[in-house]
């Protein structure tokens, strides 16, 4: 899976995605009219997809359209990510929803105004 997200402030978006998901970045690609940052999973983001942050007059942040759902491994990791979201300029705009069967889910806006989601899964204890 590869994700491309439009941004208006590349430095701010880099801080957000590094801080929330532990992604590491590669050198910037300057491909006029776009400036592109590629972020890759690190040890702290085991199942995170690769992400490109694109600053371009052809791409605009949005809270509609396709919804990208980032998965973290534990409910504790979900709570830690939500703390980082708030600290790095994002907005959590729904409560964490317990979807049953050990799944939790929440919607938010990143620091650029893109709507994304977070989910976590922990197996339920055996009865």
Language-model regions, residue ranges each:
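Short hydrophobic/aromatic beta-strand element in the GNAT-like acyltransferase core
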Residues: 36, 50, 69, 105-107
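Acetyl-CoA-dependent GNAT
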Residues: 53-58, 121-123
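Short amphipathic alpha-helices within nucleic acid-binding modules
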Residues: 16, 76-84
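Conserved, structured core segments of small domains
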Residues: 45-56, 103
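Vicinal oxygen chelate
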Residues: 5, 28, 82-127
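Core segments of cupin and vicinal oxygen chelate
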Residues: 4-48
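Acidic/polar helix N-cap motif
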Residues: 9, 74-77, 110
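N-terminal beta-strand motif that seeds the catalytic metal site of vicinal oxygen chelate
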Residues: 1-15, 68-70, 120-127
């Amino acid at each position: 899976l590869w994700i491309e997200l439009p941004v208006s402030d590349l430095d701010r978006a880099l801080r957000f995605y590094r801080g929330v998901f532990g992604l590491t970045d590669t050198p910037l690609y300057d491909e006029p009219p776009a400036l592109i940052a590629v972020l890759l999973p690190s040890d702290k983001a085991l199942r995170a997809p690769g992400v490109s942050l694109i600053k371009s007059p052809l791409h605009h942040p949005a809270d509609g359209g396709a919804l990208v759902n980032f998965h973290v491994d534990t409910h504790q990791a979900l709570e830690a990510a939500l703390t980082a979201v708030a600290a790095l300029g994002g907005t959590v705009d729904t409560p964490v929803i317990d979807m049953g069967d050990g799944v939790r889910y929440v919607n938010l806006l990143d620091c650029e105004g893109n709507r994304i989601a977070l989910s976590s899964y922990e197996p339920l204890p055996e009865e």
